[in-house]
């Protein structure tokens, strides 16, 4: 079964366990997802089945839109509600100051990712080391925060939305907001992914893969059997000859090619659609 669609993961379940449920529902063994959501988070998860599991890196998955609720003063190494150690009682802030702290995130942002993350250190996941009590530090990363919005402020909870680049840690954004308000600790009490690029939840409606790819369509004017059997393609037979990734339409299937230095290579061949 080849299928590409957007599912909605509920809070309280890991992405892999949720995928197992999807596999059972659709009676398939081969399926995957793009963009892991933490167990406490909910929201959209792109699901691919069959040969469509190969398409994830070619999908238009950015920017991503999140809605989060920050608990000011809540201390947790996971930066969510999983390991709350203590809660500082704080005086209420002026809403204008809260908005200013949120808007200050916009632009290019350098920050440390959470120690409870999937980042690897010498082949080990950071969250495994953190749970084992190993002390370590992570290199700072850069994210682009395109736009932020204050949704509501009901002290000590701040709900905000953020449009961000791929790989952004929203838990870290929450802590940064707290710090810029002069608060040492802050953890997310809720997190929802509203969309990944153009992908939003629509009751598992199958996606048109030709409209989901993050690249231009090219046109091949040579023998169609070359695409059918995965034979070498000549650059002169392509309508667009400049370097880049392209998809080619063969009616019942597509191929994804990479043009570089006047050579044409297959990235994916014969994906049925």
UniProtKB/Swiss-Prot annotation:
Catalyzed reactions: uridine(55) in tRNA = pseudouridine(55) in tRNA
Membrane spanning stretches: none
One annotated GO biological process: mRNA pseudouridine synthesis
Active site: 38 (nucleophile)
Alphabetical list of Pfam families matching this protein: TruB_N
Taxonomic classification: Bacteria, Pseudomonadati, Campylobacterota, Epsilonproteobacteria, Campylobacterales
Keywords: Isomerase, tRNA processing
Keyword Transcription: no
Family designation: Belongs to the pseudouridine synthase TruB family. Type 1 subfamily.
Purpose of the protein: Responsible for synthesis of pseudouridine from uracil-55 in the psi GC loop of transfer RNAs.
Protein name (Swiss-Prot/TrEMBL): tRNA pseudouridine synthase B
Key word Translocase present: no
GO MF terms, alphabetically ordered: RNA binding; tRNA pseudouridine(55) synthase activity
The EC number(s) this enzyme carries: 5.4.99.25
Uppermost EC category: isomerase
